[in-house]
Amino acid sequence: MQYQNDLILRAARGEAVERTPVWLMRQAGRILPEYRAVREKLSGFIELCTTPALAAEVTIQPVDILGVDAAIIFSDILVIPEAMGLPYEMQESKGPFFPKVITSAADIDALLATDAADHLTYVYDAIELAVKELNGRVPLIGFAGAPFTILAYMIEGQGSKTFSKARRFLYTEPVLAHRLLEKITLATIAYLKRQVQAGAAMYQIFDSWAGVLPPDQYREFSLRYIKQICEAVPQVPRTVFSKGAFFVREDFNNFPCETVGLDWNMDIGESKKIIGPHKTLQGNMDPCALYLSEEQIRVKAKEMLDAFGTQSHIANLGHGLYPDTDKTKVKCFVDAVKEFGVKK
């Protein structure tokens, strides 16, 4: 497809760009009154995810309202365990909750793997609708959760500060852990292939809980499976965002992805040296910096851009937008990137 604005694709591929592209994790969400107006008419988050026309509508909202350089499909990383046979609920103000969790080999054997992707047609339909409506204005980003992050929820049953149950499972049941991770990986590969077929022009793998593991475990139980996914779905630019995994930045030097996401705790200059010049970096302003005044946000955005340089960088935050962030502050950040990110 030909895009009117393909900055993000060129930046991901390491090609020259006239300015730094920008998008935001959780850009389609509660920060937008327009999103809340759609959401309040429904039973909840999951109904919005599973209604293609509405998911497509809120996917496009940030492009129109904030002026970002890409849309990202409105969905959730936990649609994968749901499709595999482990349903979840999204509890208001508490987050995801799994009434049943994985505790045994029999539980794992009962899960679908590759065939799970067949149960996610609502996501592909939403992508197709959004791509059609965008009509080449900007690319659409697909995404999935990293297998370890998905396992963490399937074992723990909900969010956690420590994910001690999931981590204990890796120590005490490593064979079962790998069996579960292999199934999640197969499901994710099939899922991302279908997203690309539906029109996703690039994709991101979110390893939200990477930072809870020590380096050796992270390489064994997470990074190897992310690599398997990236190698299996190479048709479009690939971004890997391993939050908190500062200890494996060197591993990304020769990793099968085009872009590496940095969280706000990762020093930009140090990361550029460790990861190397042949990878595009994404990030990494602290989401809390958007609580500053607009003048201060502009200063912070310029500092970030100066540190990254105008090439091989996709501007973003170091994690998702917080729900109570002022929309005008978010727009200020996007506009600042567009102003200060111009190649000189």
Curated annotation (Swiss-Prot):
Annotated catalysed reactions: uroporphyrinogen III + 4 H(+) = coproporphyrinogen III + 4 CO2
Residues that bind substrate: 26-30, 76, 153, 208, 319
Residues annotated as site: Transition state stabilizer: 76
Q: Which UniProt keywords apply?
A: Cytoplasm, Decarboxylase, Lyase, Porphyrin biosynthesis
Coiled-coil regions listed in the entry? none
Q: According to the UniProt record, what class of enzyme is this?
A: lyase
CDD domains, per database record:
URO-D (cd00717)
Which terms in the GO cellular component ontology are assigned? cytosol
EC numbers: 4.1.1.37
UniProt pathway annotation: Porphyrin-containing compound metabolism; protoporphyrin-IX biosynthesis; coproporphyrinogen-III from 5-aminolevulinate: step 4/4
**Disulfide connectivity?**
none
The biological processes this protein is annotated with in GO are: protoporphyrinogen IX biosynthetic process
Q: Which InterPro entries match?
A: UROD/MetE-like_sf, Uroporphyrinogen_deCO2ase_HemE, Uroporphyrinogen_deCOase
One GO MF annotation is: uroporphyrinogen decarboxylase activity
Q: How does it assemble?
A: Homodimer.
Q: What's this chain's function?
A: Catalyzes the decarboxylation of four acetate groups of uroporphyrinogen-III to yield coproporphyrinogen-III.
Provide the family line. Answer: Belongs to the uroporphyrinogen decarboxylase family.
Q: What is this protein called?
A: Uroporphyrinogen decarboxylase
Provenance organism: Cytophaga hutchinsonii (strain ATCC 33406 / DSM 1761 / CIP 103989 / NBRC 15051 / NCIMB 9469 / D465)
